[in-house]
Regions:
Chain A
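Short, flexible boundary segments at extreme N-termini or domain junctions of P-loop NTPases and their
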Residues: 1-29, 62-66, 163-166, 179, ...
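Inter-motif core of Ras-like GTPase G domains
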Residues: 85-112, 116-127
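A charged amphipathic helix-loop-strand protein-protein interaction module that recurs
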Residues: 204, 237-333
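Short hydrophobic/glycine-rich mini-motifs in sensory/regulatory modules
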Residues: 337-345
Length: 388, 318
């Protein structure tokens, strides 16, 4: 199968190429928490340590690219000083796919809102499709009621101010999130920001939905293991407590793994049983990956070898399971690495995990194959566009 | 014992009440003595005396209440705040406590915790602790003491308290011996036995370098490890880090009103199972041999369960 002229044929990619979709601008007044957010998310800075961060004096670009395929979408995060303006930014707003605007929840909102409006106005002319994500930050500082009230008020004022400026601005997409570096609300909000940038999201979600229905899982996430952000989840609503547990689980496993590793240990492990990765019978008919659009997407994969290739069989994919009680019939939290940097975390009924382990494993293999194919396409696309 | 604000109640609440470090900031000063009976390993009842550290209380422990406070002491834990400005007075009280012990409980073991080590820059911790250790040993005037550097924000807390409770377990050596037999049966590279509620390490068996849990030897083993950074050496902090990690994860689970029950992993480097061993203990089995599967390990744990229940039964002073 030959590779079609790509990506210009893809309708959802803007005509100036998809290089832009990877740029994210981090804005907000001084001390609102921009650098903290960037450091906690991508550099594993312990939240308490953000206290010692120096003020940002210059625009700084942080690259989280596909080097080693470390994230599913290559990102370029621009951390800015508080006094930045549209003109001093040093790049046109049309370059950015997303603006993350950080507002300290306890601030006097006048100044941040003016700044936000200024950027919305600046973006409207050159890039009306840009996403504005407003992080109402340091939320943990307030009690639940005050938190909600401030959150509502800020949203209201922003909307009013924008309407005052020009009714056209209503078309600009604005989303509000409550965030804090001290819990996983930041990770969740940023995950949601990312989701809008993943073209193949719908296919990945489809794979996760099939996984959930085949294994009776109430919730499954696909996590990027380095950033601990989730790339996709099934269509059931995300409950914050469950998300937090998954983040904690991932963190615990990644800290645990190096503890007992011995450098004296033998060569890398090989999976004893490597089932031939064909779709499990229950999955084929309902698979969204077999819809025509997904087929078209998947078949563009350059390495479209038979999926049961010999080389792949030797790969070992780590997995883990934590069983929780006393909920009835008991829940097992499973972890399966599906690519070197993506892990499937799922809540499963313990009965399914224990009695029908084969079924679960089949579905993991099937999901892994689906993800891998989507992933190959994404990778081709991003490398192609880098040269256009 | 220890000066007010040195961190005694914080440690107690984290180890024995499963509170996260973040909650300790809300603790008020302890008034007089707070007595707590905590069950450890089911049958071993620890009677913890958390002695409020304000001066007036200290004076009273050393004088009016002297015989009550210092009689029948198994272990004295004296906490020194690393940032204290009144070390002189702290040491003065400490010496008087030792005197009280000599008089009423001469057999008691003494542990000195140099606490809030997280406030010292990471690179300097070892040196600061070494200096403190020397100073405190000198102040103890011949009484054998064990010194630990601790912080509620890292695994050092678990290391120190594992060392402390280890001295209280009556048949520790029998337990270790059986653990070794069990490890062989599992072809395990590492087996670690934890107390269930505190997740403190009570016994270990390792196929690599011996790493006993009691305080004195740990520093020696660590010094050796530091002196010869052997490529093949395992992380010397692995046991206390495990306690810390699992405790934190248990807390995450309980926030979802779930209870952590067991864990199994097949990772690139090893296979591991963490499961209940007896009513009061958890066991962690680490196997590097890729042929051994988690199911086999779980089966072995099930088989060993009775033997270990029996061993613990023997524990009960009838
Ligand atoms: N940085 C740091 N702070 C700590 C540590 N341990 C405890 N603290 C803090 O020290 C303060 C006092 O802790 P407490 O446990 O109440 O002290 P205490 O020794 O019981 O004090 P008294 O009851 O008055 O004798 C709290 O704000 C804790 O959060 C630590 O390891 N590092
Ligand atoms: N309470 C709280 N403080 C935060 C949070 N995020 C950041 N901070 C603090 O806010 C201050 C300013 O953060 P910084 O990232 O330097 O702000 P910037 O100037 O926008 O880059 C620091 O003292 C951080 O510790 C949060 O979620 N909660
Ligand atoms: Mg206290």
């Amino acid at each position: 199968m030959s590779l079609p002229d790509h990506p210009s044929t893809k309708p959802e990619v803007s005509k100036d190429g998809s290089v832009h979709r990877t740029k994210v601008l981090l804005l907000g007044t001084r001390r609102s928490g921009k650098t903290s957010i960037q450091q906690v998310l991508f550099n594993d800075l312990p939240p308490k340590q953000t206290f010692y961060l120096e003020p940002t004096m210059r625009v700084t670009q942080h690259l989280y690219d596909a080097k080693g395929n470390s994230t599913i979408i290559p990102l370029e995060l621009w951390d800015c000083p508080g006094n930045i303006t549209v003109d001093t930014l040093g790049a046109p707003l049309s370059d950015f796919s997303t603006v993350v605007f950080v507002v300290d929840i306890r601030d006097n909102y006048q100044q941040p809102i003016s700044k936000l409006v200024e950027f919305v106005a600046g973006a409207y002319d050159v890039n009306p499709g840009i996403n504005f994500e407003v992080f109402i930050h340091k939320a943990e500082k307030l009690q639940e009621d005050d938190k909600i009230e401030n959150f509502r008020q800020i949203q209201e004022r922003v909307t009013e101010r924008l309407a005052d400026e020009s009714p056209e601005y209503e078309q600009v997409a604005l989303n509000f999130h409550l965030t804090s570096v001290y819990d996983h609300s930041l990770q969740e909000a940023f995950s949601r920001v990312l989701h809008k940038l993943i073209d193949s999201l719908e296919f990945i979600e489809g794979l996760l939905n099939v996984f959930c229905s085949n294994t009776s899982s109430p919730k499954a996430f696909l996590f990027d293991t380095t950033s601990k952000l989730y790339v996709a989840t099934d269509s059931s609503p995300v409950d914050q407590a469950t998300h937090t547990l998954c983040c904690d689980y991932l963190r615990m496993l990644s800290s645990f793994a190096p503890l007992y590793k011995s450098n004296a240990a033998s060569e890398p492990r090989v999976h004893a049983l490597s089932p031939t990765p064909t779709p499990p019978p229950t999955a084929t008919s309902s698979s969204p990956a077999s819809t025509s659009s997904a087929r078209a997407l998947l078949s563009q994969s350059p390495s479209d070898e038979p999926s049961s290739g010999v080389a792949k069989k030797s790969l070992f994919y780590p997995s883990a399971a934590a069983s929780l009680s006393p909920s009835h019939p008991g829940t097992t939290l499973t972890y399966h690495l599906v690519t070197p940097h993506l892990a499937l975390l799922a809540l499963l009924p313990t009965t399914v995990y224990e009695m029908r382990k084969g079924l679960v494993e089949w579905n993991v293999v099937w999901l892994r194959e689906g993800i891998r194919e989507i992933w190959e396409v994404e990778k081709t696309r991003s490398t192609t566009t880098h040269f256009t | 014992m220890g000066a007010s604000g040195s961190g005694k109640t914080s440690m107690r609440s984290m180890i024995f009440s499963n509170n996260p470090a973040s909650l300790t900031e809300r603790l008020g000063a302890t008034i007089d003595v707070e007595q707590n009976h905590v069950r450890f390993l089911g049958d071993l009842i620890l009677n913890l005396w958390d002695c409020g550290g304000q001066e007036a209380f200290m004076e009273s422990y050393l004088h009016q209440q002297r015989s009550t406070v210092f009689s029948a002491v198994g272990v004295l834990i004296y906490v020194f705040d690393i940032e204290t400005r009144e070390l002189g007075r702290d040491l003065e009280y400490f010496r008087e406590c030792l005197e009280g012990l000599r008089q009423y409980s001469p057999a008691a073991s003494v542990f000195l915790l140099v606490h809030k080590m997280d406030l010292v820059r990471e690179g300097e911790r070892a040196a600061v602790l070494a200096r403190k250790r020397e100073e405190l040993e000198r102040a103890s005037g011949g009484k054998g003491v064990t010194v630990f550097g601790t912080s509620i924000y890292d695994e050092t807390l678990y290391k120190a308290w594992s060392g402390i409770v280890h001295t209280l377990i009556p048949n520790a050596s029998t337990l270790s011996r059986h653990l070794r037999i069990f490890a062989d049966a599992c072809s395990a590279n590492e087996v670690v036995l934890f107390e269930r509620t505190t997740f403190l390490v009570i016994a270990t068996s390792s196929s690599s370098a011996p790493a006993p849990v009691d305080g004195g030897d740990i520093s020696a083993a660590e010094a050796a490890a530091a002196a010869a950074p052997d490529e093949t050496a395992l992380n010397p902090k692995r046991y206390e880090r495990t306690s810390e990690l699992i405790k934190a994860f248990k807390q995450s689970c309980s926030r979802l009103r779930e209870e952590f029950h067991s864990l199994e992993m097949e990772l690139a480097e090893f296979t591991a199972v963490l499961d209940e061993m007896t009513k009061n203990t958890y066991v962690l089995v680490i196997v590097h041999n890729p042929v051994v599967e988690t199911a086999a390990i779980k089966m072995n744990i099930r088989i060993a369960r009775r033997k270990f229940e029996e061993l613990q039964g023997d524990n009960t002073p009838s």
